[in-house]
Amino acid sequence: MSPLDSMFLLGESREHPMHVGGVQIFQPPEGADARDVRALLDTALTNDDRGVAPTLGKRARRSWTSLGQWGWDVDSRLDLGHHVRHDALPEPGGEAQLWALCARLHGTLLDRSRPLWETHLIEGLRDGRYAMYTKMHHAVADGVSAMSMLRRTLSDDPDERGMRAPWQPPHPRPPATATDTVSAAGVSDLPRAAVRAAHSAVGELTGLVPALAATLGRAARDQGGPLSLTAPRTMFNEPISGARQFAARSWPLERLRLVAKAADATINDVVLAMSAGALRAYLHWNGALPAQPLIAMVPVSLRDEQQGSHGGNGVGVLMCNLGTHLPDPAARLDTVRTCMHEGKQALAAMSTAQILAMSALGASPAGASMLFGHHPKLRPPFNLIISNVPGPRRPLYWNGARLDAVYPLSIPVDGQGLNITCTSNDDIISFGITGCRRTVPHLHTLTSHLGRELDALEHAVGL
């Protein structure tokens, strides 16, 4: 297990569950309903001769053979009845009830004695659809790899039937063996592994000094990059509890695409500008809008498509000035666009190792808060995380049920009580807002502010 993945286990507590989640909403095929889906899943549970995907069959453990480091061990007695569960919404079965259930599920810890995931089939939606809520520990997968695993369980063909359950491998695989993957060759290979790692690091070390100097210089000039020194204190940057709130909403992706084209920006710039306007309105409504602009940490994926299907974490970060001190939506979008362009130019001049090192520099204060607790007198390194996880770009189905939407749930941490994550699916983009129930009151109002900000951006660019 990598040091980054281990950190997600070390930093976990009752107040800080460290799993990512997602809600997938499906429209059953004509003549079917959620009961038919439940029957399919029950059959897969009782006649499970296909096993589980390798990522879902491993559990975290430490032992003397790994010198106390976290590693992975295959669970040879995996109990699917524990991991796959059924839930039903109370009346009237609307989005408010669905988000409330997902928030409660997202606030509970995963059992570390088992593989670190759960899937919940949720029935009772009043429009006849059904939902699947899945949570997976961040040590197992980040948002990109989790989305890749979701895509592999679905089909382009609405008429395909007999598809495997979401937890099953897409193709037959040889049985796994119980080995600790901290060091495949065991403790005896650790000295040689250390020598190899040191040798490969020598070339990178010489490049870290100028990369560090450039990163510090950009931060001092308040330019985009992996580090910021100007994030203000806000109501989001307080100690958190373990209870969660969640809200979500979708918009046609074409609306964001047209705004981006008119403003010579990217869709992700528009996502950030929508978030900036919504945060400004929310903070102003709460009498808590700071004079300085909020800073968002924006994850940047460093993995390729093949890596994405094997779990794990591979991300760098950029710090983005959201321009929340500016009343004009067009000015906020221009601020975001400029800052992200500067940041991407900075990353383009670095190697992958340098990007990871500078990203660690920018994010390390938040990691320290996660491990040791939030210090209220320290300025936050950033105010919240806003991420955009690419999803499937075409209609996808599971045994004829169409995937209508994917809503991500992420991880608030101590000192960072709010997270905004969005993902695209076919022709829509969905925002998932996860927050500490105590730190972020009335979180659901942010979705209304997002909608109004998109309207304002369209007006600002002449649409």
Model-based region annotation:
Residues 14-20, 24:
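TRNA-binding/sensing appendages of the translation machinery
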Residues 1-4, 23-35, 39-416, 420-451, ...:
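Soluble acyl-CoA-dependent acyltransferase catalytic core bearing the H(X)4D motif
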